[in-house]
Swiss-Prot record:
Name under which the protein is recorded: Dual specificity protein phosphatase 7
Residue stretches of biased makeup (Low complexity): 15-30
Biased composition (Gly residues): 31-41
Protein's gene: Dusp7
Species this chain originates from: Rattus norvegicus
Amino acid composition bias (Polar residues), ranges on this chain: 227-240
Amino acid sequence: MKNQLRGPPVRAHMSTSGAAAAGGTRAGSEPGAGSGSSAGIGAGATTGAGAMPCKSAEWLQEELEARGGASLLLLDCRPHELFESSHIETAINLAIPGLMLRRLRKGNLPIRSIIPNHADKERFATRCKAATVLLYDEATAEWQPEPGAPASVLGLLLQKLRDDGCQAYYLQGGFNKFQTEYSEHCETNVDSSSSPSGSPPTSVLGLGGLRISSDCSDGESDRELPSSATESDGSPVPSSQPAFPVQILPYLYLGCAKDSTNLDVLGKYGIKYILNVTPNLPNAFEHGGEFTYKQIPISDHWSQNLSQFFPEAISFIDEARSKKCGVLVHCLAGISRSVTVTVAYLMQKMNLSLNDAYDFVKRKKSNISPNFNFMGQLLDFERTLGLSSPCDNHTPSEQLYFSTPTNHNLFPINTLEST
């Protein structure tokens, strides 16, 4: 079966606000709610002038090994979807909707009330004053709160807990660092093949791997996959290309053209649906009747409007997953076009901001490198969906900045929230 989307290449003109993807705070840092008290800081905690108290990944590992976390209360401040995918053992999730976050900022909402699980509520209530409370987000490394800066979720919760008399700290390096170094203490719901890479991403959407594709002709072809593969703009496939498709969600796999032609791989992962995001690569098993195909005729080029196909692509992925069939999303190298479609799917189906969706995919597949213009289309898609990061931490007048991957010139952007 084949379901091919047809349409002429459309040049995507990006607005000033959509010309780059946003960062926000510096990589590895995030604004805090205040300086906080340094009382009760024990071994493994570090502070500096104005710094919020933290504990190291090594300290947490030793606590879990020695006492099984009996003297700890771990609070995961990431979005619920990321917590469900993987988290540190014994952690309680504290993802906060924007409305509740505003109430929390005003001081009229107890932290216990934002914990959804009754058993976790009781555990928090009985241990928050007696145990060491350790909060973590995705990747905060060193945190120097800046005067007047709006509070992040992590900063807001940490400050409130310390104001309430709790011995509260944040985990230096966040979940990414701890999982990289001590994965045996993390609980995950994804296949082992999608384990995060050894280089954790920062909590801010990193565009260092993005490319502004060369101005090649619209007639370029993906017909053959050479032994030394390149994306259609001539960018080489990174040497860290995974050997097999990567599981992003249950039944959703991200891969390359080679994966789509390997029956052993398709059978191993139960893949019956294949989304081919290229104009000319063949659907290898189209006539056998065993696989359902959809083809999106888009080249990896700045002029291409991939976003026009988001609704059909998302519907195709949903159809496969609803039938509990594996669906492979691939382009040529599996780093640009297919990544863009996968990120769009996470944004719509999981209500993730572009920051969170991008980081979610990058944790599974470290070598992603979307076309820079495709990221602009994802920013527009984020606006269409009305999404924002869970921090909800800047006013409309604030400007966020990010640099291009080529010359590091700064471009202002005001649509993407940092996490």
